[in-house]
Amino acid sequence: MPGVASNSDDLALIPHSPTNSHTIALHHTVKPPISRLSIAWARGNSLRVAVIRKPQAGESDDEPGGQVVEVKLGVDEADIYEAQWRRIAYGSVTPFAVLQSRKNLNTNAYNADLPAYVIEYSREINSLLGNQKVLPDPVIEDPKTVLQRVDEPTFSKAAWELMEIFFADKQSDGWIPERLVDWLSDYDNLIHGEQPTIYSRLVDFQTELVNLQAVEEDPKYWDVLSAALAVGWLDIVVKLLRLHSSYQHNQIGSRETENGLVETVVVLVSKMPRLRPNLSAGKLGECFDNKPDFVKAWEKWRGQITKLDCSAFWLQCGHQDTREGLKKLLQIMLGNASVLSATTFHWVELFIGHFLYIRPFTVGMESMYNLAQKCMQFKPGSSPHKLMELLNGILGENTEVVLAECSRSFGSWMITHAIELLTAGSTQADILLHEERNNLGGICIEELHRLVYAQVLSSHALTWQIAPIYLASCKKQGMGLLEILLYKQPVGHNQVLLKNIEICRMYELDNVGANAMKIAGVHHWKHGKKGSGVFWLQQAQDEFRLNRIAQQLFDFVGKSVSDESFKQWEGLIELLGSQSKAAGGLDFLHKYRDFKRSLQQVTDIACIDAARKASEALILLMKNPSTPQRFWLSLLYDSVKLLNWKERTLLNVPQTNLLLNKLQELSMARLRPDFIEADLPPQALSSVRLALATNLGRAILEE
Amino acid sequence: MAANNPETLQIHRIPQSTYIDAVRWLPPLSVFERFILLAVSDSNSDASLLEIRALNRSNPSILTPLSSLQLASRTSSLKVCQTPHKPLIAASSFSGSVRFLFVDNVEVGFDGSEHIVPEKSLHVGPISCIDLGGNELECVSVGEDGRVGLVSVGEGELSVRKVFDSAGLVSYSAVKWASPTEFVTGGLGFSVQWWDLRKPGAAVSQFKGNWDQGASSGIVHSIDIHPSRKHTCLAGGSSGTVFTWDIRWPQQPIVLSGAGQDAASARSLSASEVWEVQYDTFTRSSNHRISSTRVLPVMMCSEDGILAVTEEGEEPIELLVEPCAINCFDIDRQNPSDVICSMEWESVAILSRA
């Protein structure tokens, strides 16, 4: 918080302790002695340090007096991570913008299509966070590979999917438990901390599996089997059961009953009824999308399990481990709470087990929340985990907790985009997020988070241009901050300037765009790029500054324009145009060029047409109020040969009078102290006067 | 026209982790792979690089890095030219230097030899555009400082000379060779200048259309000249403007897009900056009577994310519509059906038309 400064460490917002300090070496090439260091924030997470040295006597001027070095803080973040983050930021622009415009289409009426739009948005954002694509299967399938190899899932994706399940996906409200089963199977590997999870146990077991001859002899085999069954990873259970050595050809004769029992359990597991519309490929179970059918199938399935449990075949099964292990699996499927609790590790695993085998019809947040609380009591000691805290907040229907968790653990990108899901999820959350708050300066929580995210985007050279999309969606402060953002961009660089103008065009900030052009115009002018300066000031229609620079240009012209160097001016004069009003007196240069050009063509007496044209141009110039006074004499001096034209007079009486009047005016002006004397030979004035008088005389005679 | 059918257009978007300043195809050096030249700038390390990448013909979504070279400053313009021995690369920078490099034919990569025109020797401040061509492999360069430079790339030393210096009274933003002795520049106010090295001192011809009515004026960002029609130059610039200027009829440009004076004949494809234009040799003109006054099909890319082919009096074909700017594209000379373009959001796209 700016302005909060304190002398005592107790009051400091971030307590400073010497152990926390971090040394960064500063590389510069400035020779000592260094007299001063100046430190300022640069873009993003970097500091700009100016190293200034004290000039020593007797040194050449070539020695640089200082250097500006940029120092990146927090360099330990991996490069690829940054790029990945930017990719997500870029990718989320379109879904966000599309959703906003759809929401804005009809703000008053209830938007019946909104849920469909929100889920579309959610899926698009979800796909940005990484695809859980299964890597291509090896050519020869290894029967002992139980776990499928998947790309490393991310916490953000897990969090997003959790919110999608509860807030956005209204269609699958009826089978939230099954969606949670899927969610856990994708992300169980993320929730382990100090405590193991089923996934970590499976991974451990898989490494041991290669060395095992008879898997059923190992108690771990039965442990992971029941654990995987408890959270509904049926495909893994079946795969593991098929590794049972009773399936081997040399044993099948002697262990027929045992093998029969194993296979019956396999069939029962793979026939488990599931209350969901479909299953992805490779997953097992029988789907039912309505309750009555499911209940019927469930009762039947349970009946089959009970029947098997009481069957006489168990007595004939000689292998004790197999018998006990399979019985345990049956107990899980029959929903024995204590067995479930014993086989799972984390409370969320137990939670899922309850959904699958004890309370498949759990609906409503309250019952889910109570169940979760109960599971936590059974499995205490789980270290706090960001995904679990988030799940807790969601189940407790506590929007504040969800917001706080999103913001604390996943950053501003997540919260800005997840708010769309939250507001779609419930009216209560919608009201909470859209309520204008006095303590936030009259903006709502939604706007606050968008502004923060836009600030993060603005701090990077590559993402600042997507910040306007988020700022524009903020009703109260957005446009003001957008203007500030645009004003902060360096305009000396053409690419940035054009981007700036483009954004101004899109958001109808004509005034800001014009100001950027003016700043750029002055910048270029000061750096000697006169053409660019004039161009941008013309684009901005800034007559005031054009007039100012016109004066400077005339000084320059007055000194330098010879017939030769007019070639240099050609481009600028073309740019100024002939009739454009915004040129601020600069159109004089255009006429001056025309006059000079026709004068050049007057080489001898035969060029009467050119001479006539030149004298017309002269009259035009002299009549034009924008012709600066300091050029009058040089113009007249240049045209002495026109005035003294042998054959006939080129200027009639009124025209000559006009020129004489101008000459008179000039003589008066010379008395003023600020008059600038043209760079002409001393006899120029008298020769012009003489020529004009002669011409007047001849013209009167001719008339 | 063929490209209109989405089934015949394959697009591969390849995300990068750096900003791409420029992208060019390299001439074919191998049967199995294609090669691409990228000028990138890494925002993390503030490094600018020139990279050669290999593109697998069978799987065009993988770009394998082959060779890379650190540059002192960001690349403002990048050109490739096939010489009798090996491809020559010229890259100009925002700090005013030009770098010439050769590509090794056998072990595809930079061959180690390079020539540099240092900063402030030819241009002060950013060089806006360069082009390779001319009599005996010359590089013409233009800059915001209003200078026009010419660098002869011989075997050994570079010879540098200034063709023109406007001392900042104008700025140039685009350049293209028209013939071994002529070239065309473009700049502010949609101005286009025709230069002839045999007539030194100033531009031979100036074109500045009468854009004052209606839409405001703009900057020419890119120029192309078709080798078979050297009298016509194609230019693209601000406000979605694409026009051609025929030096035989110097007062009338043919407007292909934007700057809506004649809205009926010129459909505006884009409303913002057109960053690059090239004649599209792949799209066959729908009008079979080939007349020399008719403008050949043109490809353009724009700030508002459009890559399209347009032809005089025809409905334009949009090849790509992106949510971000398309900064640069290149049509493969040997395989005109293939186009590579670079996007503002750190990615490149490879398009193959059939």
Protein language model regions, located:
Chain B
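Conserved blade-ending motifs and adjacent loop-strand segments that build the rim/top face
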Residues: 15, 254-280, 314-334
